[in-house]
Amino acid sequence: MAQQTPLYEQHTLCGARMVDFHGWMMPLHYGSQIDEHHEVRTDAGMFDVSHMTIVDLRGSRTREFLRYLLANDVAKLTKSGKALYSGMLNASGGVIDDLIVYYFTEDFFRLVVNSATREKDLSWITQHAEPFGIEITVRDDLSMIAVQGPNAQAKAATLFNDAQRQAVEGMKPFFGVQAGDLFIATTGYTGEAGYEIALPNEKAADFWRALVEGGVKPCGLGARDTLRLEAGMNLYGQEMDETISPLAANMGWTIAWEPADRDFIGREALEVQREHGTEKLVGLVMTEKGVLRNELPVRFTDAQGNQHEGIITSGTFSPTLGYSIALARVPKGIGETAIVQIRNREMPVKVTKPVFVRNGKAVA
């Protein structure tokens, strides 16, 4: 039977259509996915992300451990509260998960990992943490609400006390701060400003209701997916998995190659892949009628006249742009156009960088 977050009752009261999402009953939408999408782009919406897993790591060798566990380098994290995004790789360079890591003190870091990968992540982290003497605490006592949109921070701040408002004042993106019983982070999965707020389970429902009363619209998984796709953000299991290199998933920027003597899991395999080349992730735009869908083939002819085929990893209709967009993993050598087979029609698509909307504006 699927698990319920502490906000399950609030979703039903708000009229949500609930679906099983990787073993969790989660809201798909509250009536109109399109309306929810636009609300986040133009005002403020919120998502229950309590199904994600918060993992606290403590011990004198925590930084050393994370420099080995992750492809990105936590040596960059020197200011308390600063976060970074990283892949956690296997020995062959495949992505076990993508996650966010927060630094608080030398002996206290926090990870936020995906729900679909929870059990394998915890097993992998525990296995590799043992030699470093790390104390691992899974924070199942916390719920998490993502408040996103151009007015999200202002609307959320109306619920903060003076100390909390002071704690987040001027906080840059990718920071988190514990302020009273709220952990408030300037992170998100929509391409908009906002907060991801972790708080005790027993306080989550009241906080959610107060946000609703403050004019923040509840949003479901449907809008979350179209928003993240417009923003060019990867979804684990689609853009990457344990068989796909971060180099083939537009995650090359998350690999810290320097210092050259840092040994991290998957480094050797990545160095070979970097030398020989991998597929790459691109954006596709189709302004003609129709919708680009996951797993459709993408065909193109390179400059030498050779034919190649890739695959759409995520595709949808973009509510912000009014036409279809997709992320696709393709061989190198793709030009500015390609062909996607939709049923029995060959549809021309424009090849772009894998990002379509930033701060509510088209970039593709």
From Swiss-Prot:
Domain of life: Bacteria
First-level EC class: transferase
Catalytic activity: N(6)-[(R)-S(8)-aminomethyldihydrolipoyl]-L-lysyl-[protein] + (6S)-5,6,7,8-tetrahydrofolate = N(6)-[(R)-dihydrolipoyl]-L-lysyl-[protein] + (6R)-5,10-methylene-5,6,7,8-tetrahydrofolate + NH4(+)
Entry EC no(s): 2.1.2.10
Xref: Pfam families: GCV_T, GCV_T_C
Keyword Transferase: yes
One of the record's GO molecular function terms: transaminase activity
Keyword Transferase listed: yes
GO CC, any one term: cytosol
Alphabetized UniProt keyword annotations: Aminotransferase, Transferase
Subunit field text: The glycine cleavage system is composed of four proteins: P, T, L and H.
PANTHER family in the record: AMINOMETHYLTRANSFERASE, AMINOMETHYLTRANSFERASE, MITOCHONDRIAL
Function in brief: The glycine cleavage system catalyzes the degradation of glycine.
Similarity comment: family membership: Belongs to the GcvT family.
Identification of the protein by name: Aminomethyltransferase
